[in-house]
């Protein structure tokens, strides 16, 4: 049976007695990796290969006789070969917890819609840390987009835990080699406290549980935290939370920490502010003590008793310890004062939760390029805010699909309430991504760029004078385009509409073409003018209609022709007037009809001629009157046919002249007169017409 204080070390793969412990130094504190430095001696192994020790599990045990006082388990992270006198070999070793491995991996990585427990579980699992426990009492909502940006897994874990008000420590089983990592967000989840009496006698045995020195101190720390943030989904939201520190009667309250951005988008920001405040004041009141007991380590609570200063006899939370053991007699031939153990520790009052101070978040150095992503077969993938998803060039985990990143806002040339510029980056396009305040969790697309596979419109440098806005038909090969060409002497504005083009002008529109204007319409054209239309042609106008033309005038149509109008109709011409039609010709009107002219008048027909009327009929003229026909002349009425004439004059004379005159009455011929002269040379020749009397060129001879 062993007696007294002693230390042993075992390493996986080596015999239990391979090393004797000369001394060790175990440094521990909340939310940090413990470090166990050992000086060892071995008579059994005068030489060891590094592969036999490094990355192996090592177990330090503190004994009091045959009773285990403390066990510590960890990974051998450093090993040194020391002096060798051919009888024994001195070694030095550093042991760290399995969590230490997380400090060797640096990564760029995206976590989406995961809470802190899920994120930490992934990190720990990938680093082989399987023995761990989350003890959470506070709400820790999922994060939409959380980026590990160039940090080691350990730095990322520590930063995230600090943001969420979580501290961690190694929980050591006293009677076995079990040991686990504990992540906790409240002091209430720590093991129940155990009493330790005050005993200033420094010569007590390790087996005597007591504290020999205990000093309580306070210092001025930040007094309040104000944290603020912004979310575009609630632009009018104040986004501010204030948190006053507790237990600060001994200091002023002017030491405010203002944090922007606060990395929150809702009411959860109040917890962030409170956790920050606890972190900034985690060392405002600290007691430091000394004991020979190895049972005091971070993650435990103790209750001090028997101290002459009564207010110190209370529960305390252990936040750090520095355990140092000496066993010089382990080296054969070396003398010493025997095995010793000292524990210097730090505690804070147990009525408050110790939390880590906020850690700096890595900042993105500048803009980055990324590629817009979406579901297979989709060309445009966005949400109701015009946000898109991208695949970052450094992302090794997410596929290039609709889940490659969070929704990312896109900067536009102009953004107003219901107005501005909008151009959604399309799947496959390369974009330039910046980060608000350099925060990798807040990407924003600031621009787009071409690359070797996504070429520009046109063919550079040949089209270098062109400024082009060209779209692409959704799931097609067409495009709409607005192009400005500034080539000297060939300046041009070009507009291309793949299908429809609509122009809406709420007031006036003016088009001024200095030279020529040509319009070609492949199918139909419709122009609707609500009020008036004025069309002015300076010289000539030619209008060609290939088939039919219909002109409808609702009321009045006035047509004024300065000189000549010619109308040519190939087949038929019809004019229909619903009411009255007046035709006024200042000088002459001529009508030429190739075949036939028909005139139908429903009721009356009046013709008034200021001077002469001439009818020339090539063959036959027929007048047919249904009832009465009256021929009236003011001075002279004449019928002529060859050498036959019938003349009526206004003085009542009737002249009948011809080579032969035949009078036949089938029943009778009647004649009455006061005087009848027959064959006595009494008859007169018919008089001339008034025009013939004036020797006009139209006078006839009979």
Model segments located where?
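Polar/acidic, low-complexity leader/linker segments enriched in S/T/G and N/D
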Residues: 1-19, 209-211, 365-371
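Short, well-ordered loop/turn sites that connect or cap secondary structure elements
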Residues: 52-53, 296, 312, 425
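Structural signature for extended repeat/solenoid scaffolds and their inter-repeat hinge/linker regions
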Residues: 175, 180-186, 365-657, 662-664
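Acidic, low-complexity/disordered segments
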Residues: 309-370, 446-452, 456-467, 684-687, ...
């Amino acid at each position: 049976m062993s007696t007294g204080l002693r230390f042993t070390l075992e390493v996986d793969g080596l015999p239990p007695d391979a090393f004797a412990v000369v001394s060790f130094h175990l440094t521990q504190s909340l939310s940090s990796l413990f470090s166990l430095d050992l000086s060892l001696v071995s008579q059994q192994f005068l030489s060891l290969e590094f592969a036999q020790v490094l990355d192996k599990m090592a177990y330090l045990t503190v004994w009091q006789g045959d009773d285990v006082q403390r066990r510590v388990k960890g990974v051998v992270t450093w090993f040194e070969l020391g002096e060798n006198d051919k009888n024994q070999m001195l070694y030095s070793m550093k042991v760290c917890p399995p969590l230490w491995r997380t400090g060797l991996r640096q990564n760029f990585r995206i976590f989406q819609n995961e809470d802190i427990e899920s994120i930490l579980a992934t990190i720990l699992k990938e680093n082989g840390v399987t023995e761990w426990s989350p003890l959470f009492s506070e709400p820790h909502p999922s994060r939409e987009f959380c980026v590990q940006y160039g940090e080691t897994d350990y730095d990322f874990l520590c930063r995230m835990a600090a943001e969420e008000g979580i501290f961690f420590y190694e929980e050591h089983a006293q009677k076995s080699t079990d040991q686990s990592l504990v992540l906790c967000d409240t002091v209430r989840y720590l093991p129940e406290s155990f009493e330790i009496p005050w005993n200033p006698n420094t010569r007590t045995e390790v087996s005597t549980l007591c504290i020999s020195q205990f000093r309580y101190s306070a210092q001025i720390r930040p007094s309040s935290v104000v944290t603020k943030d912004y979310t575009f989904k609630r632009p009018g939201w104040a986004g501010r939370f204030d948190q006053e520190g507790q237990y600060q009667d001994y200091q002023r309250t002017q030491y405010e920490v203002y944090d922007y951005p606060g990395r929150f988008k809702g009411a959860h920001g109040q917890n962030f502010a409170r956790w920050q405040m606890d972190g900034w004041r985690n060392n405002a009141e600290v007691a430091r003590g000394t004991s020979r007991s190895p049972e005091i380590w971070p993650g435990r609570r103790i209750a001090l008793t028997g101290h002459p200063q009564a207010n110190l006899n209370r529960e305390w939370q252990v936040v750090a310890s520095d355990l140092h053991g000496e066993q010089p007699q382990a080296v054969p031939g070396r003398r010493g004062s025997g095995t010793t153990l000292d524990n210097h520790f730090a505690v804070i009052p147990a009525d408050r939760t110790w939390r880590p101070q906020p850690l700096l978040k890595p900042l993105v150095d500048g803009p980055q390029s990324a590629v817009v992503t979406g579901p297979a077969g989709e060309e445009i993938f966005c949400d109701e805010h015009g946000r898109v998803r991208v695949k970052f060039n450094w992302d090794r985990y997410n596929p290039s699909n609709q889940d490659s990143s969070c929704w990312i806002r896109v900067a536009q040339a102009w953004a107003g309430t219901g107005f501005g510029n909008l151009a959604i980056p399309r799947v496959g396009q390369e974009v330039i991504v910046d980060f608000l305040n350099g925060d990798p969790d807040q990407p924003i697309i600031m621009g787009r760029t071409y690359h070797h596979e996504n070429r520009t419109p046109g063919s550079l440098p040949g089209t270098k004078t062109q400024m082009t806005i060209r779209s692409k038909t959704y799931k097609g090969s067409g495009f709409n385009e607005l192009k400005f060409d500034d080539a000297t002497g060939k300046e041009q504005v070009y507009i291309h509409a793949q299908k429809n083009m609509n122009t809406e002008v709420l007031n006036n529109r003016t088009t001024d073409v200095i030279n020529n204007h040509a319009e070609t319409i492949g199918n139909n054209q419709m122009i609707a003018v609500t009020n008036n239309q004025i069309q002015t042609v300076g010289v000539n106008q030619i209008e060609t209609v290939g088939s039919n033309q219909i002109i409808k005038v609702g009321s009045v149509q006035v047509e004024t022709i300065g000189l000549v109008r010619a109308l040519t109709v190939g087949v038929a011409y019809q004019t229909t007037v619903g009411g009255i039609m007046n035709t006024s010709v200042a000088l002459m009107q001529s009508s030429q009809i190739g075949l036939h002219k028909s005139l139908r008048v429903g009721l009356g027909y009046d013709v008034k001629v200021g001077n002469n009327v001439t009818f020339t009929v090539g063959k036959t003229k027929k007048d047919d009157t249904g009832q009465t026909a009256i021929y009236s002349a003011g001075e002279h009425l004449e019928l002529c046919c060859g050498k036959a004439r019938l003349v009526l004059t206004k003085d009542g004379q009737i002249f009948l002249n011809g080579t032969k005159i035949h009078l036949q009455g089938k029943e009778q011929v009647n004649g009455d007169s006061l005087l009848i002269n027959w064959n006595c040379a009494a008859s007169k020749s018919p008089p001339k017409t008034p025009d013939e009397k004036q020797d006009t060129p139209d006078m006839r001879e009979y």
